[in-house]
């Protein structure tokens, strides 16, 4: 097993522990608590994949961080802070919308890279809006936290989420996954719209109705792909 993979997991475990202690003092806001909950699931998945104990990894991560901080200079800290200042966390959904359980009458699922796409293909003739919570750096989508498809009545009918055991994805991965989800929903004559933040950072171009501008041929291809693969 690669040593960098192990040490990265150890540091992530310790930093999660620090953030958990912060949250236990009721100091974290909703986005902070949401990331904490999802990172916990991710760490459990990674620990299982790597065969590493989280408690032991947390102790080892603490030692690594302490060694780094002992050598940290003020100038290096300033440079790190400057790079972080460009990172933003954008939220279309409330914490309740993100944590709400939902059920599918005709469940369909597809794994695309490190992203899992789920949708209910029993939904027909509805107007659906895609909402997402994600981080942005230098005006580009960096990490998708969660994307969900809602009907006008507020029901959840689709979702794109990172797989805890396969961390890491690009903005193109997210765009492709959104295309698959839209294609699957449109197959049943649903009208799909995209939130303003997703239009700005995930699609870059859209029509006036908030719908991604995809050629009809590409729409049909996505729908067929979803029907056969999801």
UniProtKB/Swiss-Prot annotation:
UniProt modification remark: Upon interferon induction, ISGylated via host HERC5; this results in the impairment of NS1 interaction with RNA targets due to its inability to form homodimers and to interact with host EIF2AK2/PKR.
GO terms assigned for molecular function: protein serine/threonine kinase inhibitor activity; RNA binding
Record localization: Host nucleus; Host cytoplasm
Region spans: PABPN1-binding: 223-230
Entry remark concerning the domains of this protein: The dsRNA-binding region is required for suppression of RNA silencing.
Membrane-spanning parts: none
Name this polypeptide is given: Non-structural protein 1
Region of interest (Disordered), ranges: 205-230
Family per similarity comment: Belongs to the influenza A viruses NS1 family.
GO biological process annotation, one example: symbiont-mediated suppression of host PKR/eIFalpha signaling
Annotated organism of origin: Influenza A virus (strain A/Chicken/Hong Kong/31.2/2002 H5N1 genotype X1)
UniProt main location, coarse: host cell
A GO cellular-component term linked to this record: host cell cytoplasm
Stretches the record annotates as CPSF4-binding: 180-215
Region described as RNA-binding and homodimerization: spans on this chain: 1-73
Role description: Inhibits post-transcriptional processing of cellular pre-mRNA, by binding and inhibiting two cellular proteins that are required for the 3'-end processing of cellular pre-mRNAs: the 30 kDa cleavage and polyadenylation specificity factor/CPSF4 and the poly(A)-binding protein 2/PABPN1. In turn, unprocessed 3' end pre-mRNAs accumulate in the host nucleus and are no longer exported to the cytoplasm. Cellular protein synthesis is thereby shut off very early after virus infection.
Keywords: Eukaryotic host gene expression shutoff by virus, Host cytoplasm, Host gene expression shutoff by virus, Host mRNA suppression by virus, Host nucleus, Host-virus interaction, Inhibition of host innate immune response by virus, Inhibition of host interferon signaling pathway by virus, Inhibition of host PKR by virus, Inhibition of host pre-mRNA processing by virus, Inhibition of host RIG-I by virus, Inhibition of host RLR pathway by virus, Interferon antiviral system evasion, RNA-binding, Ubl conjugation, Viral immunoevasion
Motif Nuclear localization signal: chain residues: 34-38
Domain of life: Viruses
Subunit structure: Homodimer. Interacts with host TRIM25 (via coiled coil); this interaction specifically inhibits TRIM25 multimerization and TRIM25-mediated RIGI CARD ubiquitination. Interacts with human EIF2AK2/PKR, CPSF4, IVNS1ABP and PABPN1.
């Amino acid at each position: 097993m690669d040593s960098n993979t192990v040490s990265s997991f150890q540091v992530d475990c310790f930093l999660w522990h620090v953030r958990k202690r912060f949250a236990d003092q009721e100091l974290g806001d909703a986005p902070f608590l949401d990331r904490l909950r999802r990172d916990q699931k991710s760490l459990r998945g990674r620990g299982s994949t790597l065969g590493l104990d989280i408690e032991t990894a947390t102790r080892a991560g603490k030692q690594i961080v302490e060694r780094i901080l002992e050598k940290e200079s003020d100038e290096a800290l300033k440079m790190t802070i400057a790079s972080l200042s460009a990172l933003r966390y954008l939220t279309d959904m409330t914490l309740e919308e993100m944590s709400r359980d939902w059920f599918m009458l005709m469940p369909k699922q597809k794994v695309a890279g490190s992203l899992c796409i789920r949708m209910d293909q029993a939904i027909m003739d509805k107007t659906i809006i895609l909402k997402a919570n994600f981080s942005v750096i230098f005006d580009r989508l960096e990490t998708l936290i969660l994307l969900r498809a809602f009907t006008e009545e507020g029901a959840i009918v689709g979702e794109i989420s990172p797989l805890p055991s396969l961390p890491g994805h690009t903005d193109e991965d997210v765009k492709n996954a959104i295309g698959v989800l839209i294609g699957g929903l449109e197959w049943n004559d649903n009208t799909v719209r995209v939130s303003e933040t997703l239009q700005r950072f995930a699609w870059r171009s859209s029509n006036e109705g908030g719908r991604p501008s995809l050629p009809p041929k590409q729409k049909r291809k996505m729908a067929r792909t979803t029907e056969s693969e999801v």
